[in-house]
Curated annotation (Swiss-Prot):
<feature type="binding site">
    <location>
        <position position="186"/>
    </location>
    <ligand>
        <name>ATP</name>
    </ligand>
</feature>
<feature type="binding site">
    <location>
        <begin position="17"/>
        <end position="18"/>
    </location>
    <ligand>
        <name>ATP</name>
    </ligand>
</feature>
<dbReference type="GO" id="GO:0006436">
    <property type="term" value="P:tryptophanyl-tRNA aminoacylation"/>
</dbReference>
<dbReference type="InterPro" id="IPR024109">
    <property type="entry name" value="Trp-tRNA-ligase_bac-type"/>
</dbReference>
<feature type="short sequence motif" description="'HIGH' region">
    <location>
        <begin position="10"/>
        <end position="18"/>
    </location>
</feature>
<protein>
    <recommendedName>
        <fullName>Tryptophan--tRNA ligase</fullName>
        <ecNumber>6.1.1.2</ecNumber>
    </recommendedName>
</protein>
<dbReference type="GO" id="GO:0005829">
    <property type="term" value="C:cytosol"/>
</dbReference>
<dbReference type="InterPro" id="IPR014729">
    <property type="entry name" value="Rossmann-like_a/b/a_fold"/>
</dbReference>
<keyword id="KW-0030">Aminoacyl-tRNA synthetase</keyword>
<dbReference type="InterPro" id="IPR002305">
    <property type="entry name" value="aa-tRNA-synth_Ic"/>
</dbReference>
<dbReference type="GO" id="GO:0005524">
    <property type="term" value="F:ATP binding"/>
</dbReference>
<feature type="binding site">
    <location>
        <begin position="145"/>
        <end position="147"/>
    </location>
    <ligand>
        <name>ATP</name>
    </ligand>
</feature>
<keyword id="KW-0648">Protein biosynthesis</keyword>
<dbReference type="GO" id="GO:0004830">
    <property type="term" value="F:tryptophan-tRNA ligase activity"/>
</dbReference>
<dbReference type="InterPro" id="IPR002306">
    <property type="entry name" value="Trp-tRNA-ligase"/>
</dbReference>
<comment type="subunit">
    <text>Homodimer.</text>
</comment>
<keyword id="KW-0436">Ligase</keyword>
Amino acid sequence: METVVSGIRPTGNLHLGNYFGAIRSFLDMQHRYNCFFFIADWHSLTTHPHPDNIVRNVRTILAEYLACGIDPEKATIYVQSDVREVLELYLYLNMNAYLGELERTTSFKEKARKQPNNVNAGLLTYPTLMAADILIHRAVKVPVGKDQEQNMEMARKFARRFNTIYEVDFFPEPESFSPGATALKVPGLDGSGKMGKSEGNAIYLADDAKTISKKVMKAVTDAGPEVPNSVKPEPVENLFSMLRIVSSDEVYRHFDDLYNNCSIRYGDLKKQLAADIVAFTTPIRERILEIQADEAFLDRVVREGAERARESAARTLAEVRHIIGFR
């Protein structure tokens, strides 16, 4: 069975974009692959989160993953910092990484531009740590978005370079994995782009009905169509895209027909969209609250996930040490 690895930084609650863009695919993948899903708390240290927030954010993501249906009996769910072997492999890969290639990565240049007063070594070597996360389990597939494709190419480069330096065929070159039709891009509520964690742009799986309704009713629209069958402007198309995802085909066609004959009332569209989002998220939200209240269950998932992840990582690291010459 092929091994798949995917990580998420614990920087905020999961939203509809996370669910339809990734998690829904994970629910299928956990039955077909040897899956390792981890919460990347080490990666979050580049932005220096408050110590009190680290554990809380990890527990939040863990509870939300479980509430969505990721099964710890079928997939290994673990916290990155519980697998110390990753740091040792990170060290070895850094010894074979070159300053110039790390400085040229788009992700580093973009983050350095956004936070010029915090251009730390963790940002620079982000691709190396990401490669260690993947290669520690000798994964062959990694579900990532286009924004991570360059880092995936770096991971393949580091795997290939290790094999070349030590004249072995040990690390596979991991492939970027597209989940296919199950992955959907969910637009944000601010009129453009995909849904993200910025304030006002996202609907979180843990949001209650009142919060969801308030966010949807504030979504950007225009004055309405004046010409039948006209092209929808991006903010309006975004609302229809969300409607297509969470509503029935009948509901979508109803509002599409109203738009095309210039009789649509955006208030009615937003009310329907909010109601359908609430209907979808309410069972997940209730499950999140239930899981968060069960500290013993969360502790057990973390402990057992760490044990399974470390067992896999230790096997890889033992061979890596032998190949390098630590015997």
